[in-house]
């Protein structure tokens, strides 16, 4: 499987394509590079891979389907690589300022609606993904984490998130 790399048009930094085991994005360097976590904006899936794995898991309607497909392929002994060069570009200013896992500066109801929306990080879908690839314990912990951080007041979240993000 080959994932196409996308760069930011002004800075020429990689912003999408694939990342390594530590979740660092992999930049174009003229060679195919191993990918752990596939980002699926531009992907070439050979017929033999599709014949073995099939379509994306239907449970994933927006988020995590690409990552799941790449991990499933690797679990079945296949490889995922980056393209050798950037094949697309975008303007970072067009990217959403809202994180999938928590929307700031809104009330709890709107925050939870976003979390459970197709553009959020639906905890049940994320639980399914985490259980499939990281086990039940990780899935349970992350499920509760998503709800906990969405209950935090913005002032607390802003302090805590600076430490992590």
Language model segments and positions:
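Structured catalytic cores of enzymes that bind and process phosphorylated ligands/cofactors
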Residues: 2-5, 43, 74, 91-92
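Short beta-strand-to-loop element that shapes/binds the nucleotide-sugar donor at the catalytic cleft/hinge
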Residues: 2-16
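Short, hinge-like loop/turn segments at secondary-structure boundaries
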Residues: 18-22, 98-101
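A recurrent flexible, glycine/aromatic-enriched loop bordering the glycosyltransferase active site
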Residues: 24-45, 113-114
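A short, conserved alpha-helix in the catalytic core of glycosyltransferases
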Residues: 43-54, 59-86
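Short secondary-structure capping/turn micro-motifs that flank functional sites
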Residues: 66, 89-90, 147
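Active-site donor/metal-binding and catalytic loop motifs
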Residues: 76-108
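Non-catalytic, C-terminal membrane-associated alpha-helical segments of glycosyltransferases
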Residues: 100-165
């Amino acid at each position: 499987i080959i994932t196409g790399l996308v760069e930011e048009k002004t800075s020429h930094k990689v912003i999408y394509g694939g990342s390594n085991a530590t979740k660092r994005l992999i930049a174009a360097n003229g060679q195919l590079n191993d990918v752990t976590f596939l980002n699926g904006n531009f992907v070439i899936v050979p017929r033999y891979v599709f014949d073995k794995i099939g379509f994306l898991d239907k449970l994933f309607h927006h988020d995590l389907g690409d990552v799941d497909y790449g991990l499933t392929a690797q679990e079945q002994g296949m490889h995922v690589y980056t393209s050798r060069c950037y094949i697309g570009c975008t303007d970072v200013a067009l990217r959403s300022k809202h994180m999938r896992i928590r929307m700031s500066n809104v009330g709890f109801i709107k925050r939870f609606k976003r979390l459970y929306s197709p553009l959020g990080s639906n905890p049940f879908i994320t639980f399914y993904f985490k259980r499939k690839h990281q086990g039940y314990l990780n899935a349970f912990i992350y499920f509760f984490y998503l709800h906990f951080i969405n209950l935090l007041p913005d002032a607390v979240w802003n302090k805590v998130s600076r430490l992590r993000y």
